[in-house]
Every structure is written in C-alpha cells, then in structure tokens.
C-alpha cells in the first residue's frame, strides 16, 4: 500500500494522463516511464527548457511540443481510448482532441523504444543550470 501512495505522489504535477502514458511506454520500450524518464535531461519530467541532451531527451522535447499544439482539451487531464496490437499502439475514439493527445503519447513511446541505445545515466537528474540556454522552437 505504501508503494501505491508513493507512486501517486510522484504522479502529481507531471504532465499528461500518466497512467495511460506509462502503460504505452512500458508496452513499447519495456521500461517504466516513471523510473527511467521522469527526471531525464532537460525535457523528460515536469517542464522543459534548454537544449535536448540526447535523442532520448529529444523524444520528450517533441512530446512537449506535441502537447503544446493540442487545442480543445487538456492533455494533462484527458483520458483517451487506445489499444495495443502486437508491437504497436492504435489510438481510437471519436474525439479528435483526445485522439491527438493519444498520438502524442504514442509517438513518444515509440521514440523511447527506438532510442533505447541513446539513454545515458549521466543525463539523469541533470543540474538545472544545464538547461538554462534558450529553448529551440518547436
């Protein structure tokens, strides 16, 4: 029970419907999104500034940009419909906004999978000074 409470606290204040996104990341990469990507580089986790540190961090940068383009619903609170088929995620439902959020999460999960080899522990919990340079545009 204590583990569930800690997980719930960790999920507070982080972007997106984390449970669905977490499941997508786990399905596509075999890794826990919370454990591996919640505080990585300049963009993985809450907020994002500066230059992406590597291809994995760029996945988070692109995900942030994707969320920034969504209009008509809140990516931070939305629950969408999706299914997993073999090694892919299929976004469903009739709501275009929710489907767009799902596609943002799907693309990030695939990006994490495709860039597993770029993950470098030196970018875990980087000092905030590392991410102070001006961000590139989406």
Swiss-Prot record:
SUPFAM superfamilies: Phospholipase A2, PLA2. The active site is at residues 63, 105. Expressed by the venom gland. The keyword Disulfide bond applies. GO terms for biological process: arachidonate secretion; lipid catabolic process; phospholipid metabolic process. CDD domains: PLA2c. Keywords: Blood coagulation cascade inhibiting toxin, Calcium, Disulfide bond, Hemostasis impairing toxin, Hydrolase, Lipid degradation, Lipid metabolism, Metal-binding, Platelet aggregation inhibiting toxin, Secreted, Signal, Toxin. GO terms for molecular function: calcium ion binding; calcium-dependent phospholipase A2 activity; phospholipid binding; toxin activity. It holds the Pfam family Phospholip_A2_1. GO terms for cellular component: extracellular region. It is found in: Secreted. PROSITE patterns: PA2_ASP, PA2_HIS. Residues 1-16 form the signal peptide. Its EC number is 3.1.1.4. Binds 1 Ca(2+) ion. It catalyses: a 1,2-diacyl-sn-glycero-3-phosphocholine + H2O = a 1-acyl-sn-glycero-3-phosphocholine + a fatty acid + H(+). Its cofactor is Ca(2+). Ca(2+) binds at residues 43, 45, 47, 64. Disulfide bonds join 42-131, 44-60, 59-111, 65-138, 66-104, 73-97, 91-102. InterPro entries: PLipase_A2, PLipase_A2_Asp_AS, PLipase_A2_dom, PLipase_A2_dom_sf, PLipase_A2_His_AS. Belongs to the phospholipase A2 family. Group II subfamily. D49 sub-subfamily. Snake venom phospholipase A2 (PLA2) that impairs hemostasis. It weakly inhibits ADP-induced platelet aggregation when tested on platelet rich plasma from human and rabbit blood (15-25% of inhibition at 5-10 ug of enzyme), and dose-dependently inhibits blood coagulation, possibly by inhibiting thrombin activation. Exhibits high hydrolytic activities toward L-dipalmitoyl phosphatidylcholine. PLA2 catalyzes the calcium-dependent hydrolysis of the 2-acyl groups in 3-sn-phosphoglycerides. Monomer. This is Acidic phospholipase A2 Tpu-E6a.
